[in-house]
Amino acid sequence: MDSPCPVAVGLPGHTNGTGGTSSPTCNQSMIKLAPYSPEATAAFATAITLMMLITIVGNILVIIAVLTSRSLRGPQNLFLVSLAAADILVATLIIPFSLANELMGYWYFRSVWCEIYLALDVLFCTSSIVHLCAISLDRYMSISRAVTYGPKRTPKRIKCAILVVWLISAVISFPPLLSMNKNKGGGESGALPQCQLNDERWYILYSTIGSFFAPCLIMILVYMRIYQIAKQRTRCPPGEPRKEAPANATTPQHKIQNGRGDETPGTLQKKARPPTLAVSQVESVQQAANTPIANNLLQAPSTTLTPTTPCPSPSPSNSSEVAPSKSKEGKKEKKKKKNNKNKNKKEPDNNNGESMSSDSDTEQGGRGLEVPCTPTMTPSGIHSPATMQKYRDMIATAKGAKLVARKAKQDGTPNSARRKAMVNREKRFTFVLAVVIGVFVICWFPFFFSYSLQAVCPESCALPEPLFKFFFWIGYCNSCLNPVIYTIFNKDFRRAFKKILCKNTKGTFF
């Protein structure tokens, strides 16, 4: 085998040790040392250069978008700024030297820079995944402890957390500076200088676990917990009433008050149609609506009822409908109530959408109820617009009153709309971060797994060198993917990027 040139290869007019020109043997060795053909070298260099440009430009756009867009100015997005800065450093300080080392087949630069280069490579890669781990923990705290954690999530605290992330990354990447196993080459052996990854077993296990596997496990567990919490809140959102039971179901027992102040449980069967309670023919709609009920969900807050005359107790019945009374007394009472109908207002109960406005309801157990028939009402607040709005769903009929059961309307105040928009933005942001973490794991797992095999079984588990290099460069590709993910999956970033790129650049940042 021809011996390689004793010093740096590829310099024009290079002389040998005797002062003459390079020998044909040296020139042949130079050709043999080239790892790729000229065509492959040009294609590889073009692809990696394009990747570097996308990484730098895309992550600069991310930083500008977070710092200038109102919808992205939350303190938690400072994590994305730091993550984008790490990706920019990878594209400017790591990938160019890795590309030169790959295409030339040896380390052209000084050995001191090799030490710094390897340490920075591990530092930036570790900081990326530790950033993602910190972001996932921040997501979990904001979802599980929204009330207490929200006020604590200040820009100052987030910046302190980012500083801790970089310190942890530095602790993991610092040992290579103490113990490096580099193949410097040169000297008497004539070998070319190399700058390779540390192949000491202790450091391989230390760096792979600290830089990838431990943070990856934390992120997976945290996002599993986030998914469980989100699923629970989808079924029963906090602060909202539970959904109504199906129309053919039996409602739980309700407690209604009779004229003596006793609480009597009653069970009503829901029908397929809206529930209607028949009332006595001698009672008007207004009388039926004036029955005092314990549940006052629809009752005007300023309305006061004072029962004066109890109704006669009807016979026990297991039905929710009461037979009409045909007494003369009732007819007189009916005429009297018709004359005073403008003085009274309906006050139905809205317990789970059931109408309980009959003046002669009976409990299911068979005991009759005395319900007051002539309550008096204080005039304050009865005819206010708010009170009229509450009874919009009441439909008066000749036999009584019928309530159309429907779900309570959502609060339409600006605060609730703002809160809903914030919750939706948090959901979208959580989904985008889940995609970012998933892509990161897919890109870097093959490299870290194959690298750890060198410590576990260096001889039997060794991968082919081309495959290991492929995994190595796939990991670097992750640095340019985050801006693409933000653009595809988050409309806030998409809107911010469009605003940055399409606005008039006169007098602006550019």
UniProtKB/Swiss-Prot annotation:
User: Which regions are flagged for Basic residues bias?
Assistant: 333-344
Site (Implicated in ligand binding): give the residues. D121
Task: Report membrane topology.
Answer: Multi-pass membrane protein
Q: Extract one GO molecular function annotation from the record.
A: alpha-adrenergic receptor activity
Q: What is the designated name of this protein? A: Alpha-2B adrenergic receptor
Query: Which PROSITE patterns did the record assign?
Result: G_PROTEIN_RECEP_F1_1, G_PROTEIN_RECEP_F1_2
Annotated positions for site Implicated in catechol agonist binding: S207, S211
The subcellular location is: Cell membrane
Q: Which UniProt keywords apply?
A: Cell membrane, Disulfide bond, G-protein coupled receptor, Glycoprotein, Lipoprotein, Membrane, Palmitate, Receptor, Transducer, Transmembrane, Transmembrane helix
